[in-house]
């Protein structure tokens, strides 16, 4: 087995064939739960039809079982060690990257993306090259949920994509639609819930297939098949209790790394099934080859088009990693190499599996094959950079954002977190009991009382007191039950255990603010922002706290920073409107409030602020309109003290 080079320089593209490109990525989709991959217990007619008119890769694998880094590999053709997106949260695709959307946009394509989860929000750099990047998640009551758990149903995402598609004419387009429904919790809608009552994960997949069908029907009506290249990939799979893991992210077994991968369009034979191992990094060079071009820059992926005519493509080696156990759990990270025959996993207790004899990876044969282990370890070291240790830091800001942050005078001390990926820490295999407790707490939200869920998490925390995720999840459950003081004590105890991250300081800040301790809240929000400036929800809270303390210049810098990171942030526009009022500039305030309402018609704070502004200017009709909008949408639980005052103001305007 020869050592593969880490990357291959590719020639720049000349003019590409003007074909429409439609990429659908389906989150958490195991290929062995699709009919076209052999599962007779599920109906997936849209994906079956796509496979029938194109190529299906029978042995496709992802580079990591995590959504952002896996998508980064799909779009760049690079391993995570090269594109630098290593985990969910805390990492940004560098602005210097040349992802697929940038390549096609530079060649004249219209580009649009519609994503279904906040883990792919534009602030982490995936909007590079997209003219439209729709990452708006649904509201939770009167608060838009920007947390990593925020998602929207595939039908809503496809609706938005179809609206955009209907505006396209003339130019070729690149449309990316990301569907998140197979991700836990599994709660398929309507008839799918009834039909797949005993297999809700399959129900989510069947529902998603229907949304794929809706989208592809519209694509085919917009232009004939000869004008469209369509690709479907899953970003990773789902363990479904195999190997003691219930979801994904912790281990590197095929349950979470085998993916669905199919393509159809000009230059792709119908009904072809490719058996050799291929990788998610191979998508980019393959697509560009179909368009008559080459992938630019240093990539690790290979063009699979020769495989369509039976030629071998040297995709024998696939690098795999998950740093999630280290960054989220405080355990050891895992790295591995997969070939057509072998799976080698570097861990505190390393593993080797013969996939031809043991495809479910149940018998570790490491001791029986020392020579193979040596070869695979050499391959792994070659790809991952040599030594057994690597120092990484969360790169929540790229160079453009750092420049913007400095120009605004915001956050003089950005403090990225450093991690040593040295294989040290508990082997995740030894923490299966913790994973079981976590799953029991997460998966029983409609079955167990809140107190029981908290007890389960506290049991896990006693067994693993240095696990950051356990503090976050236990604290969240305590907050849901109104045990705010207990949650605050828990978060502070996490700091005492040496755990520090932006999310932890943000939660301490929110709870301090609830107790009326504004000074501590501001201090904690500032710490959170220094660790992760792209936690925009915390940044909004920091700006609001500054305003309430009369620190108008500081508030203005924060809100402007937010808009530099996300120009469509409604809350930041509302905040700058409040700043403009403090600066006695009602015209600017009105513009900001109008923009906030335009971006988010349900942002009731902006509705109320417009009402007050129009009342002050003597425009009684508009003041009434916005006060009525506020009263129609404001939650009594959140705005109980304000609603009577707005009603009183409205009465004076009748």
Regions found by a protein language model. Give the residues of each.
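Short helix/strand-capping connector loops at secondary-structure junctions
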Residues: 1, 355-359, 624-634
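Catalytic domains that recognize anionic headgroups
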Residues: 2-510, 514, 523, 534, ...
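Generic detector of contiguous secondary-structure segments
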Residues: 392-405, 600-621
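Structural signature of tandem alpha-helical TPR/SEL1-like repeats
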Residues: 445-456, 480-493, 500-503, 514-527, ...
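Structural marker of alpha-solenoid helical repeat scaffolds
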Residues: 463, 497-498, 531, 565, ...
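A hydrophobic alpha-helix/topogenic segment detector
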Residues: 540-541, 574-576, 608-610, 615, ...
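TPR/TPR-like alpha-solenoid helical repeat scaffolds
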Residues: 612, 638-654
